[in-house]
Amino acid sequence: MKYLHTICLLFIFVARGNSRSCDFCHNIGKECDGYEKECSSPEDVCGKVLLEISSASLSVRTVHKNCFSSSVCKLEQFDVNIGHHSYIRGRINCCEKEQCEDRPFPGLPLSQPNGYYCPGALGLFTEDSTEFEAICKGTETKCINIVGHRHEDFPGDISYNLKGCISSCPLLSLSNATHEENRNYLEKVECKDAFQLARL
C-alpha cells in the first residue's frame, strides 16, 4: 500500500497546464474518465502521464490527464533506479488535441550491475529523505536528484525528493521549470556522473 500511495501522488512531479481546455482525471491503471477543465497560463497543452513504480515482482501503474506546460513535455520519459530493486518510470505525452496517444512501457531489461552507484531516495511530503545506495545497472551511468514542492487544494503543500541512477540526463532544468504562482516549484535539478564502486 505504501507504493500505491506513493505513485498516486507522483503526478506532482509534472506541472499542470492559456485558454485551452483539457481532460482532467487520475486513476490506477492505464485509463481514466474525468471532466474537462480550462487551463491557465503558463500551461498551454493537454497531456497524459503514465507512471509506474516497480519493486521486485510488484508493479503498479497510474494515469494522470491534465493541462501541462510545454517545457515539462520535453522530459517525455524517465526511468529512475532508486535502489532496492525498485524503479520509478514515467511516460509523458503532450498534444494539441484532447486524446493524447500513449507512450508504451517496455519491459525492464535484465541488466547486471555495472560497477557504479548513486544516492537513492524517494521522499514525499519532505525534501529531506533518507538516502541509501542505489546500485546502477546496464547503461545507468548518471545520478539524478530532483527536489521541489507543489501546492494543491488537497492535500495542500507537497514536497518531494527523487534520487537514483538514470541512463541519460533529462531535458529538465530550473531554467525551463514553470513557477505558477508558487503552485509548482523545482528547487533542485541535478544530473551528474555516477560514482564508481570500490574494487575489493
From Swiss-Prot:
Q: Which GO terms describe its cellular component?
A: extracellular region
Q: Name one GO molecular function term.
A: phospholipase A2 inhibitor activity
Q: Which domain of life is it from?
A: Eukaryota
May I ask which residue range the UniProt record assigns to the signal sequence? 1-19
Read off the CDD domains from this record. Answer: TFP_LU_ECD_PLIGA
Instruction: Give the main localization category.
Output: secreted
Disulfide links within the chain: 22-46, 25-32, 39-67, 73-94, 95-100, 118-143, 136-165
Q: Provide this UniProt record's keywords sorted from A to Z.
A: Disulfide bond, Glycoprotein, Phospholipase A2 inhibitor, Secreted, Signal
Localization per Swiss-Prot or TrEMBL: Secreted
Tissue specificity = Expressed by the liver.
* Glycosylation (residues): 176
Q: Is the keyword Calcium in the record?
A: no
- Name the protein family: Belongs to the CNF-like-inhibitor family.
PANTHER family associated with the record? LY6/PLAUR DOMAIN-CONTAINING PROTEIN 8, LY6_PLAUR DOMAIN CONTAINING 9
Q: What does this protein do?
A: Inhibits the enzymatic activity of basic phospholipase A2. Specifically neutralizes PLA2, myotoxic, edema-forming, cytolytic, and anti-coagulant activities, as well as intracerebral lethal effect of the basic myotoxin I from the same venom (AC P0DQP6), crotoxin heterodimer and crotoxin subunit B alone. Does not block the enzymatic activity of crude acidic PLA2 fractions from the same venom.
Which protein is depicted? Phospholipase A2 inhibitor CgMIP-I
* Species this chain originates from: Cerrophidion godmani
